[in-house]
Amino acid sequence: MSPRVGVTLSGRYRLQRLIATGGMGQVWEAVDNRLGRRVAVKVLKSEFSSDPEFIERFRAEARTTAMLNHPGIASVHDYGESQMNGEGRTAYLVMELVNGEPLNSVLKRTGRLSLRHALDMLEQTGRALQIAHAAGLVHRDVKPGNILITPTGQVKITDFGIAKAVDAAPVTQTGMVMGTAQYIAPEQALGHDASPASDVYSLGVVGYEAVSGKRPFAGDGALTVAMKHIKEPPPPLPPDLPPNVRELIEITLVKNPAMRYRSGGPFADAVAAVRAGRRPPRPSQTPPPGRAAPAAIPSGTTARVAANSAGRTAASRRSRPATGGHRPPRRTFSSGQRALLWAAGVLGALAIIIAVLLVIKAPGDNSPQQAPTPTVTTTGNPPASNTGGTDASPRLNWTERGETRHSGLQSWVVPPTPHSRASLARYEIAQ
């Protein structure tokens, strides 16, 4: 028996309404019979229940979200597996039912946010991401559809479903690209490991869209957009924006992850500085303890390769002892060998492009997608040095009087009930 209205999972969670269908499962509004509260239940799709890889990914999602506890991260309450009348066991997550609206729906309705609301959203999101980054987790799919805003202006990040612990064995296939093309970091589009700086890049794209009303890169398909993230600089932001705001977004959208803010905390601190009227601080280029600095995105140009080769040769010469003037013969290649090397390089580049095309998601953020996965329970607070500073900037109350249209709500996000004291904000469009 497939999930349907009235089904009770594990004798406790009674499904009441289908909210959304995503890549891995369905999200239902349900009632917890034991505690008498409304919850969201994400049920793994039946066609994936017999697939060990999908089952493991679903379990990993539960473990990931169970590590985190922060007001800015939607909560997970429970995980379980339930027998479905002879169809085998089906896994599910029980999550916080968020009373809010996804940012992509807000932007669709308003065009862009006022500057003060955009900066408030970015700082809150950065501080919430820092909790995950301090725990060794990378979200890998930061986008407006995964950023919810409650009637009081509280930001909640959802859908850590493709997040993975940086130090854990990957569940996804080697080289698999995870993320959404419009918001993907260049290193992710190339199939490299995602880092906290990758989340910062994606959040920078969100910020670009929030303050300008458009995404930095557009194209006919996911591959085109992803290649622009890899190779092209973002178009200049509108000149009516303050210089420090433009500088903040420009820093987060550099191609080299080592040149960005290294995690959500330093980014949030930079946003706080901008909100206070100061210039954003330059990112620290010191890599996190125990990790090598990420490599720059390769440009594929002969000049870059030649410069790197020359630098390595010079360093090698300095480190070798004198050999009495004897120099080994210089290695040369025949024209046939050079042709083979050139062909191998072209084939390698084509392989990367094909991999991106096969696995990257659709370019838009409004198409049906996997339901966001809220997150919860941390085993203690991270050290103060990992929090990225204190949240000194006051959170704005985004609530205004009057009705708010709720179009395009996604995941398990629900509009306020008639008993809500405040309706969702009709966000001010920046002039």
Swiss-Prot record:
Its EC number is 2.7.11.1. The modification Phosphothreonine is found at residues 8, 21, 64-65, 90, 125, 152, 158, 172, 174, 180, 224, 252, 302, 313. Is activated by autophosphorylation of activation loop threonine residues, which results in conformational change and allows substrate binding. It seems that following ATP binding, phosphate is first transferred to Thr-180 via a cis mechanism to activate the kinase activity; phosphorylation of Thr-180 triggers PknA to phosphorylate Thr-172/Thr-174 via a trans mechanism. Phosphorylation of all of the activation loop threonines is necessary for efficient catalytic activity. SUPFAM superfamilies: Protein kinase-like (PK-like). Gene3D superfamilies: Phosphorylase Kinase, domain 1 (3.30.200.20), Transferase(Phosphotransferase) domain 1 (1.10.510.10). Autophosphorylated. Phosphorylation of Thr-180 in the activation loop is critical for the functionality of PknA. Autophosphorylation level increases in the presence of H(2)O(2) suggesting that PknA is activated by H(2)O(2). Phosphorylation of the activation loop at Thr-172 of PknA is critical for bacterial growth; PknA autophosphorylates its activation loop independent of PknB. Dephosphorylated by PstP. Residues 1-339 are cytoplasmic. Disruption phenotype: PknA depletion in M.tuberculosis results in cell death and aberrant cell morphology, and leads to complete clearance of the pathogen from the host tissues using the murine infection model. The active site is at D141. Changing T172A: 10-fold reduction in transphosphorylation activity. This mutant strain shows severely compromised growth. Loss of autophosphorylation activity and weak transphosphorylation activity. ATP binds at I19, A20, T21, G22, G23, M24, G25, Q26, V27, K42. Residues 13-272 form the Protein kinase domain. It is a single-pass membrane protein. Residues 282-291 have a biased composition (Pro residues). Overexpression causes major growth and morphological changes that indicate defects in cell wall synthesis and possibly in cell division. This is Serine/threonine-protein kinase PknA.
